[in-house]
C-alpha cells in the first residue's frame, strides 16, 4: 500500500521552527471546536511533517510476519530519535553562534544596546526553553528505542544457557549474565541510556573548569600537586632536610608543616595515610581530577578515553585503579582468562574506599560507582538522571556480583564472605516492585522532586518503571478534565471513572502541542506493538482505560486541525479504535467546505483503510445526537407565527410578517450548519440512498420542530432531494424544472428503480418510496415558506411609495408565485400522512402538521391574494379553488384547522379573497396566468365580476 498522502521527505521543512510549549495553544482553543477551525497564531515546525511522514510510511507496508512488522516499528522509533537528535544538535549550534555574537556586542555601550540586551535575554529564555524541550524529547525516544526491543521480543530470544566450569573471558561471563537475567538486561539498557544522555553534556574540561581555576596553575594540567610539592621543597631547603620528611620528627613538627597539617610525601596515599592535607590549590586540582573521572564513568566513556584524559594530567595511575569493570563497554579491552574472584574482591575494596577512605566526595563517589554503592554516589548527584544512575548502577553491579558468586565456584563464595559490600538488591527489597518504588522515591527526594514532576521526566519515569499504561491513562484523564472544565467538550469526552489521585504537574497540558505530539506517537507505537503481540487493550476490561488514553491522540488531532494540517488528520484518526475513529474524523473535518478538498480527504481515508461509507453514515448521527433531535419537543406549535394581527385588507389580504425567516438571511447556527455539512459529505460517497433520505428527513424534522427556518432553507438549497437522487442514480431523473421544483418526486415514484438498488437496499420498495416522499414533502414546505417570505417582502415594497416597482420586480413576483404554487401542492393533500407496512403516522409528523399547516396555508392565501390584486385575478380564482379543495369531504387540511380552532380565520381569508375577486379588475401586462386551467375547473372571472 502506498503512503496515504504526500509529505516532504526532507527533514528540512519549509515551515518555521515550532514555538515553545508555553507560547502555543491554550486549553480553550483545543477543547472548543465551535470557536475556530483554524488558528493562524500557532506556528508549525518541521517535526510535524516528519513524524507524520514516517508513521505513514510504516502504515503503508503492512506485509510480513509480526516479528518483521515489530522490527519496522522499532525502526520508526529510531527514525524519531535520529531526527530529534539532529534538531537538537542544530539548535545547540545556533545557540552557540548567538551567544558568541552577543559576547561581541557587549563591547559596545549605550542605552540602545541595553534595550537590545533585554531583547536578547528574552530570546535566550525562549531558546533555552526550546532547547530543554528538545533534550527531553531526545531522551524519551532514545529510551524507547533501547527498551522496547527488550519488552517486545520473540520468546526464543535470550534463552538461558547452562553454565559450565570452563575458563571464560570477562565478556563471556558478562554475556552469560545478561542472557540469564531479564531484569539485568533492562537495567543495563537504562544505564546505557543515562550514560548516552550524559555524554551530550558540556565537555569534561568545561565541567571541571571552576575547580581547575581554583587550582591556580594556569594552563598547566600535568605535574600533580604543584603547590604542595613547592611547599615541601621550600621547607626542606630552609631547614636543610635530606630525604623524606617525617611528620613525626620533632623539628618538622615545629616547622611550617605543623601549622597547615600538610602532607610530607607526594604518593597518592599520603593524604589518607598521614591524615594530613594538601595545599588548598592542590585540593581543588585533586577534586577536579576525581570529578572528571566521575563524569567519564557517568557518561560511559571507554577506558581508552579515560586513560587519555588522565595521561594528559600525568595521573595515569588512577585509570588502573578503576579498570576492572566499566560495565563491559564493548570498546574496552577483553580479559581472556577472567577470574571472578578478583572482581569480587576488587568490588569490596572499592566499597571500603567509598565508605572509609578517600579525600573528597568525588573520589569516594568514583569508587562508590565501581563498588555499586549508593550513599557515596548520591552525595554528588545533582539531577534526577544522576540519582537514577546511582541506583541502577548499584543494582546491576550487585546482580553481577551475585551471579559471579553463584557460578564462580567455592573460591568466589569464600572471597565474598571475607569483606563487606553494599547489596543494592536487598536494599531495594522485592524485585517485582523495586523499580516503581525507586521512581516514586525520586518524586519526594530533595534533589529530584522538582524535576520528577516535569511531564517529560514523568513520562521517562513511567517508561523506566514499565508503568506507561498507567501514565497514559492518567494523562488522558487530565486532558479530559481540562477540556471539560468550562463546558462539555465534543472532542475529548468526560469519562465516569472513580476519582484517582494523581498530580496534575506530572502531565502535559492541552496547550503543550509538542508534548501532545510526543504522547500521540508514543501511544500509537505502544498500541501497535501490543497488537502485534496479541494484546488488545481496546476490548474487554481495559477498554475504558484505553479510550481515556486515546485522548492524547484526539488532542493532537485537534491541534492539527487548528494549524490547518487536515491532510494528516485521517492518518492519526486511523490509530483510534471503534466509533471514535469516525467521530474524531468528523469533528475535525466538518469545517471543510470545498468539494475537492472533501474528496481528497475521502481518498486519503480509503488509502488508510478507513471505511468511508461508515464515516459519512456516522456523521449525521453524530450531530443529530449533539442536538438530541429525537428528544426535542415541537416548539414550533407555539413559536411558528408569521401572520400579522389585524383584519385583512382589500389589496393584500391578511398581512404576513416580512423577513419571518430572520433578519440575517444567510446566517445559520453552527450546530445546524454542521448537520447540513454532514449531509453534504454523505452525497460524496456512492450508495447509501436510503440512509441519506432517512437522515435528511430527521434533519428537516429537527429544524421544523425547533423553528430553525433559516437552517431548513439552507438545507433545502444545499442538499436538494432531486440532487440526492441524481447523485446516487445519475440516469434516473431528468433535469429539474425551475418553475416546478417539486415535480421530481412524481418522476421518481413512477420510474423503474434500478435492480441493484432494490437488491442491496435494506428496505422494501414501499418503504423506500415512502421515505423519499417524506423528504419531498418536507422540502416542499420549506421551499414554499421561502417563496412566501419573498412574496411578502415584495408586497411590502409595493406599499412604499418611495420604491417604484420595476418590470423586473413584477416578473420576480410572477416567478415566485409559480414556485409557491408548485411547492404548496404536496402540502395541501395528505402531507406527511403516508406510511408503509401498515404503520401509524409518526408523532413528530403530526406535531409538525399541527404547527405548520394552518399558518402556512393562511399565509399562502395572502400571497395569492396579493398576486391576484397585483398581477392577475386568476390567482384569486385559485384561492377559490383552494377553498373547494379544503372543503372536500375528509380533507386532512380542514381537520387541522378544526383541531387548532382556526377555521374562522380560514373562512375570513377566503372571504377577503372572494371580495377582492369581485371588486378588483386590474391586470398586469405580460403576467402569466392559469386561465385555461381554471376554466377547465369551472372557474370564470366574469362569474365574480360586479358590474355597475
Curated annotation (Swiss-Prot):
It is found in: Nucleus, Nuclear pore complex; Nucleus membrane. It is a peripheral membrane protein. Residues 1-39 are annotated as: Disordered. GO terms for cellular component: nuclear membrane; nuclear pore outer ring. Residues 118-148 form a coiled coil. The keyword Transport applies. GO terms for biological process: mRNA export from nucleus; post-transcriptional tethering of RNA polymerase II gene DNA at nuclear periphery; protein import into nucleus. This is Nucleoporin NUP84. It comes from Chaetomium thermophilum (strain DSM 1495 / CBS 144.50 / IMI 039719) (Thermochaetoides thermophila).
Amino acid at each position: 500500500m502506498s503512503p496515504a498522502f504526500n509529505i516532504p521527505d526532507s527533514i528540512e521543512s519549509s515551515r518555521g521552527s515550532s514555538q515553545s510549549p508555553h507560547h502555543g495553544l491554550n486549553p480553550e482553543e483545543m477543547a472548543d471546536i465551535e470557536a475556530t477551525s483554524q488558528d493562524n497564531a500557532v506556528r508549525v515546525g518541521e517535526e510535524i511533517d516528519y513524524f507524520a511522514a514516517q508513521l505513514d510510511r510504516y502504515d503503508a507496508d503492512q506485509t510480513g510476519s509480526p516479528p518483521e512488522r515489530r522490527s519496522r516499528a522499532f525502526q520508526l522509533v529510531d527514525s524519531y530519535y535520529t531526527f530529534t537528535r539532529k534538531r537538537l544538535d542544530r539548535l545547540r549550534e545556533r545557540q552557540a553562534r548567538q551567544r558568541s555574537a552577543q559576547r561581541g556586542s557587549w563591547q559596545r555601550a549605550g542605552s540602545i544596546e541595553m534595550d537590545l540586551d533585554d531583547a536578547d535575554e528574552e530570546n535566550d529564555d525562549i531558546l533555552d526553553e526550546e532547547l530543554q524541550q528538545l533534550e527531553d524529547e531526545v531522551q524519551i525516544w532514545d529510551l524507547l528505542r533501547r527498551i522496547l526491543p527488550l519488552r517486545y521480543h520473540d520468546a526464543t530470544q535470550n534463552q538461558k544457557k547452562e553454565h559450565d566450569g570452563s575458563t571464560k573471558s570477562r565478556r563471556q561471563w558478562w554475556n552469560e549474565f545478561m542472557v540469564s537475567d531479564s531484569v539485568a538486561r533492562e537495567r543495563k539498557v537504562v544505564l546505557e541510556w543515562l550514560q548516552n544522555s550524559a555524554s551530550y553534556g558540556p565537555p569534561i574540561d568545561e565541567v571541571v573548569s571552576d575547580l581547575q581555576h581554583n587550582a591556580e596553575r594556569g594552563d598547566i594540567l600535568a605535574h600533580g600537586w604543584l603547590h604542595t610539592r613547592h611547599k615541601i621543597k621550600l621547607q626542606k631547603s630552609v631547614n636543610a632536610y635530606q630525604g623524606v620528611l617525617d611528620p613525626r620528627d620533632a623539628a618538622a613538627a615545629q616547622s611550617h608543616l605543623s601549622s597547615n597539617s600538610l602532607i610530607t610525601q607526594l604518593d597518592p596515599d599520603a593524604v589518607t595515610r598521614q591524615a594530613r592535607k594538601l595545599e588548598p590549590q592542590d585540593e581543588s586540582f585533586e577534586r577536579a581530577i576525581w570529578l572528571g573521572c566521575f563524569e567519564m564513568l557517568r557518561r560511559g566513556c571507554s577506558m581508552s578515553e579515560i586513560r587519555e584524559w588522565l595521561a594528559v594530567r600525568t595521573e595515569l595511575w588512577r585509570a588502573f585503579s578503576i579498570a576492572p569493570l566499566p560495565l563491559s563497554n564493548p570498546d574496552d579491552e577483553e580479559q581472556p582468562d577472567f577470574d571472578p574472584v578478583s572482581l569480587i574482591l576488587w568490588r569490596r575494596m572499592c566499597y571500603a574506599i567509598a565508605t572509609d577512605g578517600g579525600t573528597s566526595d568525588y573520589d569516594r563517589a568514583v569508587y562508590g560507582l565501581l563498588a555499586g554503592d549508593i550513599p557515596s554516589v548520591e552525595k554528588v548527584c545533582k539531577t534526577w538522571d544522576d540519582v537514577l544512575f546511582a541506583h541502577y548502577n548499584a543494582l546491576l553491579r550487585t546482580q553481577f556480583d551475585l551471579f559471579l558468586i553463584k557460578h564462580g565456584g567455592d573460591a568466589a563464595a569464600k572471597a565474598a564472605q571475607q569483606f563487606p559490600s553494599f547489596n543494592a538488591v536487598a536494599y531495594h527489597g522485592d524485585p517485582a516492585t523495586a523499580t516503581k518504588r525507586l521512581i516514586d522515591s525520586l518524586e519526594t527526594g530533595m534533589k529530584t522532586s522538582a524535576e520528577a514532576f516535569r511531564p517529560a521526566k514523568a513520562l521517562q519515569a513511567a517508561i523506566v518503571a514499565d508503568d506507561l499504561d498507567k501514565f497514559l491513562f492518567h494523562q488522558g484523564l487530565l486532558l479530559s478534565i481540562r477540556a471539560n472544565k468550562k463546558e462539555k467538550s465534543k472532542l475529548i469526552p468526560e469519562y465516569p471513572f472513580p476519582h484517582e489521585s494523581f498530580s496534575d504537574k506530572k502531565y502535559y497540558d492541552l496547550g503543550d502541542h509538542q508534548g501532545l505530539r510526543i504522547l500521540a506517537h508514543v501511544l500509537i507505537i505502544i498500541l501497535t506493538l501490543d497488537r502485534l503481540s496479541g494484546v488488545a487493550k481496546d476490548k474487554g476490561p481495559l477498554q475504558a482505560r484505553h479510550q481515556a488514553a486515546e485522548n492524547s491522540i484526539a488532542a493532537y488531532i485537534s491541534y492539527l486541525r487548528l494549524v490547518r494540517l487536515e491532510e494528516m488528520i485521517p492518518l492519526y484518526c486511523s490509530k483510534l479504535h471503534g466509533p471514535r475513529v469516525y467521530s474524531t474524523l468528523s469533528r475535525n473535518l466538518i469545517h471543510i467546505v470545498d468539494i475537492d478538498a472533501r474528496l481528497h480527504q475521502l481518498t486519503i481515508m480509503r488509502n488508510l483503510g478507513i471505511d468511508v461509507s461508515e464515516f459519512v453514515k456516522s456523521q449525521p448521527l453524530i450531530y443529530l445526537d449533539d442536538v438530541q433531535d429525537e428528544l426535542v419537543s415541537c416548539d414550533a406549535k407555539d413559536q411558528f407565527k408569521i401572520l400579522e394581527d389585524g383584519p385583512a385588507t382589500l389589496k393584500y389580504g391578511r398581512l404576513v410578517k416580512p423577513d419571518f425567516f430572520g433578519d440575517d438571511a444567510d446566517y445559520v447556527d453552527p450546530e445546524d450548519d454542521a448537520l447540513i455539512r454532514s449531509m453534504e459529505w454523505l452525497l460524496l460517497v456512492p450508495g447509501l440512498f436510503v440512509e441519506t433520505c432517512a437522515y435528511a428527513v430527521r434533519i428537516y424534522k429537527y429544524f421544523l420542530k425547533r423553528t430553525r427556518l433559516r437552517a431548513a432553507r439552507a438545507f433545502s438549497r444545499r442538499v436538494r432531494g432531486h440532487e440526492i437522487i441524481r447523485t446516487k442514480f445519475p440516469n434516473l431523473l431528468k433535469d429539474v424544472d425551475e418553475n416546478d421544483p417539486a415535480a421530481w418526486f412524481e418522476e421518481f415514484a413512477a420510474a423503474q428503480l434500478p435492480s441493484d438498488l432494490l437488491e442491496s437496499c435494506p428496505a422494501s420498495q414501499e418503504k423506500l418510496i415512502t421515505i423519499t416522499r417524506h423528504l419531498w414533502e418536507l422540502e416542499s414546505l420549506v421551499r414554499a415558506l421561502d417563496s412566501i417570505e419573498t412574496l411578502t417582502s415584495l408586497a411590502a415594497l409595493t406599499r412604499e411609495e418611495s420604491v417604484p416597482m420595476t418590470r423586473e420586480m413584477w416578473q420576480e413576483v410572477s416567478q415566485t408565485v409559480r414556485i409557491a404554487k408548485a411547492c404548496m401542492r404536496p402540502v395541501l393533500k395528505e402531507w406527511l400522512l403516508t406510511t408503509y407496512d401498515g404503520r401509524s403516522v409518526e408523532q413528530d409528523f403530526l406535531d409538525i402538521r399541527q404547527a405548520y399547516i394552518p399558518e402556512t396555508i393562511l399565509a399562502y392565501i395572502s400571497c395569492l391574494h396579493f398576486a391576484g390584486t397585483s398581477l392577475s385575478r386568476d390567482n384569486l380564482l385559485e384561492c377559490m379553488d383552494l377553498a373547494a379543495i379544503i372543503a372536500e369531504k375528509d380533507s386532512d387540511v380542514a381537520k387541522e384547522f378544526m383541531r387548532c380552532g382556526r377555521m374562522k380565520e380560514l373562512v375570513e381569508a377566503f372571504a377577503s379573497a372572494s371580495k377582492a375577486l369581485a371588486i378588483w379588475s386590474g391586470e398586469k401586462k405580460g403576467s402569466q396566468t392559469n386561465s385555461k386551467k381554471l376554466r377547465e375547473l369551472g372557474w370564470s372571472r366574469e362569474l365574480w365580476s360586479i358590474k355597475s
